[in-house]
Amino acid sequence: MGQKVNPVGFRLGISRDHNSTWYAEKGKYQELLLNDFAVREFLKKELDNSFVSKIEIERPSESAKVSIHTSRPGMIIGKKGEDIDKLRNKLTTIMGVPVSLNIKEIRKPDLDAQLVAANIAVQLEKRAMFRRVIKRACLLYTSDAADETVRV
């Protein structure tokens, strides 16, 4: 058996970027790292039904930028932007600095593995037949997607 390599760490710098981009002075790293974990957990709980694929956090000096990649941006933004303002205020209290919130739409959710898995999970939670769900996912995502194979 060969050595096991983390696939995310293996691709960093080549085809993927870090999910958090910031620099911490000596003694502040632990605080900022725990803060990032808290923000990600909060957003996962708050945006459970919004099909969030990726959360990126950048920290320029004395501010923060949070980018949320989702296939349903309307659910996050809400009517007239009310929900996004509430979310921004909650994030500001958690992070302790002014937060700029950026919602990015994923044009082809069929190509995003995180969203495909979330869709399958939602169907299974609704007590759908698992073989039908898997077959439908494989057929749907291979026919629309540029990829030829799907492994579930």
Kindly give the residue locations of the regions a language model identified.
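RNA-contacting regions in translation and RNA-metabolism proteins
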Residues: 1-143
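Single conserved hydrophobic/aromatic residue that forms the stacking wall/gate
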Residues: 141-152
